């Protein structure tokens, strides 16, 4: 399997929402990108809003690579850009050629959009911050903006402890035990990305059957294989991973404070339940919801459960929240969907 990745970055459409009173070249701003499908539209939007709300003195250019864009979403993003006098660029991509790559219900084809952003922008920019769309900013990016690269491929945050030994064993390299990173936050040295032809290397590795059989998190595992011994390590505050299902698992309303604190810059809401779901009624989700409530999305209801795995998790949250009738109804619906 040999993919023509240059063809993949021939976007079907590029839409620029530039509401700045004074225009700047992209290289004079801090560039941040997301890669999304329809399910993560609101996540990327609130991620942008959270950065702007917490970094009002900085100049940004925001880039969203998406396989679906509708008029309402574009209009709401335009309102967001107007509110903060910023620029948001939208890139519509055809996802069909990427569907030959490893994916699953949990890991959709959109996970590969970050690779396309690295490849596309490597010819245009020196650096790029990539964020997953389930990440919210709650602090200053000044230290990150001031970071300088030498020959590192980028700057990353080590994944949680539970991922380390398992990843080293899976990837057959003990060096990953203590250095395996989470790809949700990646500050990429695009000069080095271009020089080392890393997009091509990524797809070469993804075409290797001996590599494919080791993969559990397709793009993240490949990026780790490439970045081993070639990355700056950022402190945990830039990728504070929190899973909202911990609320009913731990049954402790303060549990999230072990992960999210005053130093936290980025909160990464991993797992099935996201803070934009209508059952995520917890203090841990307020960092997202507080921004949501001052955004153009504020009058739009939170997302309902649609997929089977969402219903499975939703009913457990509802029962924990003592919403017994709704919880039982959702559990029944899940069992019907399960068959």
Swiss-Prot record:
Reaction equations catalysed: UDP-glucose + [lipopolysaccharide] = UDP + D-glucosyl-[lipopolysaccharide]
Entry's transmembrane regions: none
One MF annotation (Gene Ontology) recorded for this entry: metal ion binding
Keywords recorded for this protein, A-Z: Cell inner membrane, Cell membrane, Glycosyltransferase, Lipopolysaccharide biosynthesis, Magnesium, Membrane, Metal-binding, Transferase
EC number: 2.4.1.58
GO cellular component: plasma membrane
Binding site for Mg(2+): 132, 134, 268
Pfam families with a match to the protein in the record: Glyco_transf_8, Glyco_transf_8C
SUPFAM superfamilies for this protein: Nucleotide-diphospho-sugar transferases
Entry annotated with the keyword Membrane: yes
GO biological processes: lipopolysaccharide core region biosynthetic process
Cofactors (names): Mg(2+)
Subcellular location: Cell inner membrane
Motif DXD 2 per record, residues: 219-221
Binding site for UDP: 35-40, 132-133, 268-274
Motif segment (DXD 1): 132-134
InterPro entries: Glyco_trans_8, Glyco_transf_8N, Glycosyltrans_8_dom-fam, Nucleotide-diphossugar_trans
Keyword Electron transport among UniProt keywords: no
Annotated signal peptide: none
Pathway assigned in UniProt: Bacterial outer membrane biogenesis; LPS core biosynthesis
Disruption phenotype: Mutant lacks two hexose residues from the outer core oligosaccharide: the glucose residue added by WaaJ and an additional residue attached to it by WaaD. The side-chain GlcNAc is also missing.
Role summary: Glucosyltransferase involved in the biosynthesis of the core oligosaccharide region of lipopolysaccharide (LPS). Catalyzes the addition of a glucose (glucose II) to the outer-core galactose I. Has a marked preference for its specific donor substrate, but it appears to have a relaxed specificity for alternate LPS acceptor residues, providing the overall size of the acceptor is conserved.
Record's miscellaneous remark: Strain F653 represents the enterobacterial R3 oligosaccharide core type.
Similarity comment: Belongs to the glycosyltransferase 8 family.
Comment on protein domains: The C-terminal domain is important for catalytic activity and membrane association.
Protein name: Lipopolysaccharide 1,2-glucosyltransferase
Organism whose genome encodes this protein: Escherichia coli
């Amino acid at each position: 399997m040999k993919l023509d990745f240059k063809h993949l970055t021939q976007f079907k459409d590029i839409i620029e929402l530039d509401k700045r009173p004074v225009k700047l070249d992209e290289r004079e701003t801090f560039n941040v990108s997301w890669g999304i499908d329809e399910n993560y539209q609101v996540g990327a939007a609130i991620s942008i809003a959270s950065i702007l709300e917490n970094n009002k003195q900085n100049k940004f250019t925001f880039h969203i690579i998406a396989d679906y864009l509708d008029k309402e979403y574009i209009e709401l993003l335009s309102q967001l850009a107007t509110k903060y006098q910023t620029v948001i660029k939208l890139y519509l991509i055809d996802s069909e050629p990427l569907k030959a790559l490893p994916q699953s219900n949990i890991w959709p084809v959109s996970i590969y959009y970050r690779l396309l952003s690295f490849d596309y922008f490597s010819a245009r920019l020196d650096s790029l911050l990539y964020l997953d769309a389930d990440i919210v900013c709650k602090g200053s990016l000044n230290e990150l903006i001031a970071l300088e690269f030498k020959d590192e491929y980028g700057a990353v945050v080590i994944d949680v402890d539970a991922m380390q030994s398992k990843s080293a064993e899976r990837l057959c390299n003990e060096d990953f035990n203590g250095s395996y990173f989470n790809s949700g936050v990646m500050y990429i040295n695009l000069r080095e990305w271009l020089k080392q032809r890393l997009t091509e290397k990524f797809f070469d590795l993804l075409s290797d059957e001996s590599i494919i059989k080791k993969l559990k998190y397709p793009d993240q595992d490949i990026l780790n294989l490439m970045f081993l011994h070639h990355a700056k390590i950022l402190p945990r505050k830039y990728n504070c991973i929190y899973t909202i299902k911990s609320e009913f698992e731990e049954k402790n309303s303060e549990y999230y404070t072990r992960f999210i604190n005053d130093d936290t810059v980025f909160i990464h809401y991993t797992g099935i339940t996201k803070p934009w779901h209508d059952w995520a009624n917890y203090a841990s989700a307020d960092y997202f919801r507080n921004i949501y409530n001052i955004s153009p999305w504020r009058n739009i209801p939170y997302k309902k459960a649609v997929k089977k795995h969402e219903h499975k998790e939703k009913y457990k949250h509802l029962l924990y929240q003592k919403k017994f009738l709704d919880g039982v109804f959702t559990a029944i619906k899940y069992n019907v969907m399960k068959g």
